[in-house]
């Protein structure tokens, strides 16, 4: 029992393998046959195109050379040679010349051979029309496009009114005449033949019109865009220059017209003015150089002169006189009055609320030296402390002198006005 079942399974496996191999062989054979057919078709088409192009080129070249060899008034021997060569080229041209229905399709120009052996140049429109006329599918198949458009065109097409248009292609085109003779009425009727042909011509004209419109539109867009770019650049430059001109008009600087007042005083006074607000810099190292400028801020003087014209007072005092003033503390008020009497006024510099004192060092006190070397900052500060060592009573008397000098200055201003 087991042996019988095993033999049955072996037979089934063998039949399955045979059927699978048969199917695989059949599919491979069919695909190979299809591939071979495609290859044959491509090779035939390639060979036909090459032969057609070569024949047309040889025919055109032979025709041109044959025409150039025809020379009037030549000698007998030369004429015989040229005639023999011309005949040889004529044979080549007749052998390789294609039929009038065959053309060389180019992008713009088509070279067509005529029955007389010459060639004519066709543009793209004429080449398409010639291809349409020589194609049997134009008359046998239904027109391309929607049937509604074809029916609408047929509504306005009348064969009786188109007799002249129908007779013209029969006379001028040998390909249409040959196809008309073969196909009418065996394949198509007379009306269908001409309806399909003229509708295809109508579609070709519409396509050419659309192409011309696209070319014109592209040319117009190119010409119209160039001036716009220039106008945009001009507008941008003008917009960039306008704010700059406005800023130049607004930014006009007027010269200063505020009168100023200079007061120079070389008197022996003004050493005790505002000790609390005095900022004294160290004197110069050489006895003949001019010391840095000392600035003294006087708030009371600023308040008194706020309602009047501001002025700048420059007082020149030597250090020897300042040292002498430290010993003479008995009459600061009288000395201040004398100094105010010697003040001179000049209108030159811009206004200021500070009094600037310029100290000229005439003595060697500010430049102590150690073995011919420059003195240190501590020695200079000690000398200044000795020169300006004052008691509290002397400071109060100096402040009272400043107040009195302010009153005298006000009187001088009134007299000056």
UniProtKB/Swiss-Prot annotation:
Superkingdom of source: Eukaryota
PROSITE patterns: BSD
Name of the protein this chain belongs to: BSD domain-containing protein 1-B
Region (Disordered): 215-234, 262-292, 323-390
Residue ranges with Low complexity bias: 281-292
Gene from which this protein is expressed: bsdc1-b
Residue spans of biased composition, Polar residues class: 332-343, 360-379
InterPro entries: BSD_dom, BSD_dom_sf, BSD_domain-containing
């Amino acid at each position: 029992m087991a042996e019988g079942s095993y033999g049955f399974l072996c037979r089934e496996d063998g039949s399955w393998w045979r059927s699978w191999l048969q199917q695989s062989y059949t599919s491979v054979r069919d695909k190979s046959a299809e591939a071979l057919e495609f290859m044959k078709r491509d090779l035939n088409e390639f060979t036909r195109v090459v032969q057609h192009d070569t024949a047309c080129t040889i025919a055109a070249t032979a025709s041109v050379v044959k025409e150039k060899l025809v020379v009037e008034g030549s000698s007998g021997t030369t004429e015989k040679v040229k005639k023999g060569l011309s005949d040889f080229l004529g044979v080549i041209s007749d052998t390789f010349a294609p039929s009038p229905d065959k053309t060389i399709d180019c992008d713009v120009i088509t070279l067509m051979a005529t029955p007389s052996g010459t060639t004519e140049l066709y543009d793209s429109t004429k080449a398409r029309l010639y291809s349409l006329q020589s194609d049997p599918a134009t008359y046998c198949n239904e027109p391309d496009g929607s049937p509604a458009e074809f029916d609408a065109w047929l509504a306005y097409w009348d064969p009786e009114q188109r007799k002249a248009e129908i007779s013209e292609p029969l006379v001028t085109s040998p390909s249409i005449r040959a196809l008309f003779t073969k196909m009418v009425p065996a394949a198509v009727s007379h009306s269908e033949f001409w309806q399909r042909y003229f509708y295809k011509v109508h579609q070709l004209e519409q396509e050419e019109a659309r192409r011309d419109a696209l070319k014109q539109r592209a040319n117009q867009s190119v010409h119209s865009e160039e001036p716009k770019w220039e106008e945009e650049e001009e507008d941008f430059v003008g917009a960039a220059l306008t704010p700059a001109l406005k800023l130049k008009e607004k930014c006009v600087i007027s010269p200063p017209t505020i009168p100023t007042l200079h007061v120079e005083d070389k008197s022996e006074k003004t050493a005790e003015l505002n000790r609390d607000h005095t900022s004294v810099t160290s004197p110069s190292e050489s006895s003949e150089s001019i010391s840095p400028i000392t600035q003294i801020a006087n708030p009371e003087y600023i308040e008194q002169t706020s309602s009047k014209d501001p002025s700048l007072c420059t007082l020149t005092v030597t250090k020897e006189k300042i040292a002498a003033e430290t010993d003479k503390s008995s009459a600061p008020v009288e000395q201040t009055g004398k100094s105010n009497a010697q003040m001179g006024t000049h209108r030159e510099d811009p206004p200021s609320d500070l009094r600037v004192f310029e100290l000229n060092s005439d003595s060697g006190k500010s430049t102590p030296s150690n073995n011919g070397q420059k003195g240190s900052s501590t020695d200079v500060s000690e000398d200044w402390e000795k020169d300006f060592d004052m008691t509290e009573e002397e400071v109060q008397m100096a402040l009272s002198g400043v107040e009195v000098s302010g009153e005298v200055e006000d009187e001088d201003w009134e007299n000056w006005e």
